[in-house]
Amino acid sequence: MVEKIVNIDGKGVRFKASAAIPRLYRLKFRRDIFKDLTKLEKAYSDKPEGGFEIDDLEIFENVAYIMAAHADENVPPTINEWLDQFGMFSIYEVLPEILELWGSNLFTDVEAKKNSGKPTGN
């Protein structure tokens, strides 16, 4: 599990990535977060200065919302209500933070699995 506070529109917003995220995402949006994040990462790396498709923006909003809701039980129950808290903010400022958080979580899970099979010294 990894947590990070990201500044959005002058507010510190907590995000959390853990093994529960794929399930929470699937239950809320009926989509596969792994496929969606792969698509989002590709769109971001192909067009770092701009030009996201509407689908990419929706994926970003969904992922950001789920990670924020996972970190803070006081997050509003809908994405629209959550987004209404903020003025216009640049996706390019926040998206790298979300992708980094997700990547850190995956790395942490892989390292934990690698180390779980090692015997402890006695």
Q: What spans do the regions from the language model cover?
A:
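Charged interaction scaffolds used for protein-protein
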Residues: 1-12, 31-52, 70-122
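Short linear motifs in exposed loops
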Residues: 16-18
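A general, composition-driven signal for non-globular sequence regions
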Residues: 20-22, 108
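N-terminal first-folded block
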Residues: 22-29
